[in-house]
Every structure is written in structure tokens, then in C-alpha cells.
């Protein structure tokens, strides 16, 4: 479909995002977890989702590996495909925000421009960049998927942090120390959500 096909007309919903938020009892936002492989993004995002669920918050977690089994199964790891991967996830996250959900995404998303692209799509005030800052040496020691070992052996090319750049956020809404206990990081995130009147429980 052409980007501006004149036969494709935007359909306005009778139920507004604000009405959906009122129904859920909280605001719809995206928490965009970014960091190196092994930094703890998925672990912290999963623990936060569990905590929010217990508080009665409507959530959904989009994980970098999971979406490549379906939504982005046709994409590889070239720069163009990686950008398209993030674009698609951003669109899905935006739809979920409009549905009034608290959306958690766990993606390396190494480039600032791509994260900014999603921020602009979702809109200021609804996009929370979460930088899980864990030293490369710690990430490599953890190596939960064995990817650093493969990258060091030359079996995996263009691996972020080894032979492909990671552009750390310059002004993330929250900067987490990935060496801290997960429970501490989850509490910091819950505090942020409450301080910004996103959740009330």
C-alpha cells in the first residue's frame, strides 16, 4: 500500500483513548527498555509487568525475541531490517497505548534515531525511555544466550557492543543501574509511574 493512498481513510473510533484510560483506571504509556544484550531489560520488564498485574494494571510486554517469531519473522539483522523491526514494534505499542494499556518493550534498540522515531509516534508524555545501564563486561559475563561468545569467536557479525555500536540514551526518563537487585529496579519504576500519575495503586 502506498504511504498516502487516497483510498485509505483514517477511521475514527467512537470510544476515545481517554475513555479507555478511565475504564482501566490508569493512563496508557510505553516503557521502552533499552540496553545491551544481557543488561537485564527483559528480566526487569517482566518483573515490573508482574508487579503491575498484581496491582490491577492492564499491561502487555513486547519482547525483542518474541516478536521475531511472528510480527517480524520476515526480518533479518541488517540496518534496514533492524529499523523496520523497531518501527513495527512502535506502531503496535502505540495501538496498545491508545487501548489504555501500560506497554513494556524490551529491545536493544541501539540507535537514538530509532528510539526517537518511536517517541514521536507515541507522543511526549506517553513514552518513557528506560535505560538499563549495565557494563559490557557484566553483560558478557552473564551472556544468557551465548551470543557474546559467538561474537568474540567471529561466528556472529554486527553484534551490538562488540562490532556494532550502541548509542546510550542521553536523556532517558529513568536511568537504571543494571547491577542492582531486580526488586530495587522495579521499585524505582513503580515510584516513577506513581510520581507521574500514570498509576494510582
UniProtKB/Swiss-Prot annotation:
It is an enzyme of class 2 (transferase). ATP binds at residues 35-42. It catalyses: adenosine 5'-phosphosulfate + ATP = 3'-phosphoadenylyl sulfate + ADP + H(+). It comes from the Bacteria. Disulfide bonds: none annotated. Its EC number is 2.7.1.25. Catalyzes the synthesis of activated sulfate. Belongs to the APS kinase family. This is Adenylyl-sulfate kinase.
